[in-house]
Amino acid sequence: MSPLPENKPLRMVANQLVQVARQDIAAETPLFSIPRNTIICAATSTLRDRIPAVFDLERDDAGLSDFEDEDDLTSSSQDSWTLLILVLIYEYLRGDASPWKPYLDVLPSTFDTPMFWSPAELSELQASAVVAKVGKEDADRMIASKILSVVRAHEDVFFPRATDTLDDTQLLELAHRMGSAIMAYAFDLEKDDETDEANEDDEWVEDRAGKTMLGMVPMADILNADAEFNAHINHGEDALTATTLRAIKAGEEILNYYGPLSSAELLRRYGYVTATHSRYDVVELPWELVEMELRERVVGRTEPSDWERIDQLARSDEDFEESIVLERWSEDPDSAGQLGSAAVFTGLPDELAEQFKGFLKAAKKVANIELAVHALADKDMRKDLYLQVVLGALQTRERQYSTSLEDDERLLDKGGLTGRQEMAVWVRRGEKQLLREAQLWVRREAHEMRNKASERGGPDDGPAAKKRRL
């Protein structure tokens, strides 16, 4: 089954403007070039000179106190993300004094990323894991700790005229706006073909993990992006240059590339979805659903306290995952930005099978559960049990969505939805499609097992046979 509804050329772009070629353009043609000194970033804004201590990322602790953790949202330390938010706020508040005022004036004031959705709009995403990743409360805490605290400590820098001071609510709103603009439009300011030696004294590239400098690049962010694309931003020594990857005919849109992102992640980061990105859709399968299916097969034979110990032992493995990501196999775009064969679901992740086996070992060790003992001793039985359990978990995961795949396809075909509703339906529909493909794959695997057992001529009445009705 195709992962996309037939005759559904969905494409909801991040920008209202679509950049099209006015005439035929040959491959490898430079479209425009942006000098690095015109990029808005920590290296070009005067804010760095006004509050240099805030921009000092060279120390090992990056400004952390002895009691602060680098991952603590309440930490006052800065990173490339928060520094750029501070820079944009500073330049925005400067008004006419900022050399980037014309650019800042055309940045969107509203965004379609789920961060700005109402509770009713978010509910349209149903059971998609992206809902938990919106993180507005976390963002509010980060802004209060790393943005508002800096602005309040340096009000003479951000508000040279006391009459222009913003209250905390206004600052929070402005910080969210700038943070969303960064997520949608910012570039990592690395250079192509960079080497360690070349970067030792390079102000554009931070050598600490997660500290690559971010910048807003006027012109470069006018290009929309898709999974199939025809242009690329080359990072040169002195400039960023947009270049065509293949011939573009007059009237065709010029498209950049943001990476192999799922529909949900594309929506979360950039506030739009496209049909071609559906090939990269993923579904998170919570481990608790797998465990629940396994427990149902030994109900009444094990004490609840035993299950708690089994669960604790299984989770003590350093590689234990709370959720397993399911995805299709998809080849990378070629050098011209084009996609080849269709994306295909080719199997369950190896880590799911390993975690399942680890749980059986824990069940054997803690309570000597007969089913676990037999499954560990018989590879075919273990695979059969594994497929049964995973199929049940996949079916339960699909039922967590309040509408069916068919319901969503009818909604998309019928039309009449708001933009945000349609994007939400598209995201949840793609995840259900992937769940269906995974279930089909499991059933085929189970069918092949039965056929092989039949070909061997052995009686199908062993311990696993009683559970093989998939």
What are these regions (language model features)?
Residues 1-38, 43-46, 98, 102-470:
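Long, positively charged leader/targeting segments at protein N-termini
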